Amino acid sequence: MSLTDTIRNTFVPIHREGYPFIAGFFVVSLILGWLWDPLFWIGMVLTVWCIYFYRDPERVTPMDDDLVISPADGKVSFVGLAVPPAELDLGYEPMTRVSVFMNVFSVHINRSPVRGKIDKVVHRPGKFLNAELDKASTENERNSVLIESPHGKVGVVQIAGLVARRIVCWSNQDDELSVGERFGLIRFGSRVDVYLPSDATVRVAVGQTAIAGETVLADYGTERGEPVVRIA
């Protein structure tokens, strides 16, 4: 094994979105340390925390169009029927929704739950209520992504929360996403909702831990052989 491979396997990758913040914390630490030595170490603790916050570990994603994979790390906080946000244009009838709540210690990178083409991306300003509240789905600031998957339209909604006030989505309309592909992040935790077609069968329960890019949230009940996976 080469030195490069050893380093890559030892240290968790950091997402590029975190580079400016990590550099900023480090520079501030140097300035504070010049004023008073103990402040340098306080600043370095915050710098390390920032590195941890923007970690972006590889995930082993099953490449199966009949599976819906978790878009976020965290706890499954809701499984049931709910009316999707109007901007998704999915109608006014309730759809199956699975919500994953991310806390401040979760990996904050969001991944596509399915393979498909993005029909639209819509950002809506709103409140910053506790993301664990059900009304946060309609009242909080959010970013809604509609994906045309092999089994129909799937809605993915990034929701800001009490602490999280910055939603990032670098994917755009007409982009093609692979299942498990990174499409955005929510700083300081919050929640991601997934709205599924009626023929999807949910495979998780409230309170269960979900891992972005790996945990199967739902499937379409078809028989399948040995799964093909992608590490990314």
Curated annotation (Swiss-Prot):
Cofactor names: pyruvate
Enzyme class of the recorded protein, top EC level: lyase
Catalytic residues (positions): S190
Recorded family membership: Belongs to the phosphatidylserine decarboxylase family. PSD-A subfamily.
Subcellular location: Cell membrane
Annotated GO MF terms: phosphatidylserine decarboxylase activity
Recorded name of the encoding gene: psd
Cellular component per GO, a single term: plasma membrane
Membrane topology: Peripheral membrane protein
Site residues by UniProt (Cleavage (non-hydrolytic)): G189, S190
Keyword Lyase: yes
Documented EC number(s): 4.1.1.65
Note on cofactor: Binds 1 pyruvoyl group covalently per subunit.
Pfam family, one: PS_Dcarbxylase
InterPro entries: PS_Dcarbxylase, PSD-A
Protein's UniProt keywords contain Ribosomal protein: no
Annotated metabolic or biological route of this protein: Phospholipid metabolism; phosphatidylethanolamine biosynthesis; phosphatidylethanolamine from CDP-diacylglycerol: step 2/2
GO biological process: phosphatidylethanolamine biosynthetic process
Biological role stated in the UniProt entry: Catalyzes the formation of phosphatidylethanolamine (PtdEtn) from phosphatidylserine (PtdSer).
Keyword set, alphabetical order: Cell membrane, Decarboxylase, Lipid biosynthesis, Lipid metabolism, Lyase, Membrane, Phospholipid biosynthesis, Phospholipid metabolism, Pyruvate, Zymogen
Protein name (record): Phosphatidylserine decarboxylase proenzyme
Reactions the enzyme catalyzes: a 1,2-diacyl-sn-glycero-3-phospho-L-serine + H(+) = a 1,2-diacyl-sn-glycero-3-phosphoethanolamine + CO2
Post-translational modification note: Is synthesized initially as an inactive proenzyme. Formation of the active enzyme involves a self-maturation process in which the active site pyruvoyl group is generated from an internal serine residue via an autocatalytic post-translational modification. Two non-identical subunits are generated from the proenzyme in this reaction, and the pyruvate is formed at the N-terminus of the alpha chain, which is derived from the carboxyl end of the proenzyme.
Subunit note: Heterodimer of a large membrane-associated beta subunit and a small pyruvoyl-containing alpha subunit.
